[in-house]
Amino acid sequence: MMDNDKSKRVGICVYGASSSRIAAAYTAAARQLGALIAAKGWDCINGAGSQGLMRAATDGALQAGGTATGVIPKFMVDNGWAYSRLTRTIVTTDMHQRKRAMATMASAFVAMPGGCGTIEEMMEAFTWIQLGIIDSGKPLVVLNTNGYYNHLIAQVEQSAAEGFMKPSHRSLWHIAATPQQAIETIERAFGQEPQPVESKY
């Protein structure tokens, strides 16, 4: 159900695949990321998926004694796609509200490997930071497990090189090879501790 109480917390928005038909290395990295988020006392925010890397990140956070908040549109709940073990589930009216809620709640973003939906979420966050819709102080970290995003990273570099985006905008995201590097990148961006965010969600 929708929770409208305002609260101030540090939450890390984790984008990632809903597919489970992937190599075990991706699942292990997602679970480790969730555990590391929990170890810092931060909330693991994701799309509430019951499969794939979203579930793995949730499981990692919960098994480490932390919390996980899932944000999911009603039609996905109706289809039985929501993970029942989440600490808190926020149901939205549609995909747009889902993405807005996750962005509003987050102190930082980590994009794990994923398909079109994950890439769209990550690039929308990148664009929102660029446009000032999202606070530019919220770091966006690409978790490049097994070099999964090498081609996308190269595409962004090419866009900057050919004048389709400002070269300075390349600094709006950070690349991490491992979950530990992702956490360290977030801490460096804030000078150690991420800033808690006040949200209506």
State where each predicted segment sits.
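Hydrophobic alpha-helical segments of small multi-pass membrane proteins
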Residues: 124, 140-144
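A donor-sugar binding/catalytic signature common to diverse glycosyltransferases
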Residues: 103-123
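A cross-family phosphate/adenosyl-ligand binding-site feature
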Residues: 2-105, 132-133, 143-180, 184-185, ...
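Conserved SF1/SF2 helicase motif Ia
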Residues: 135-137
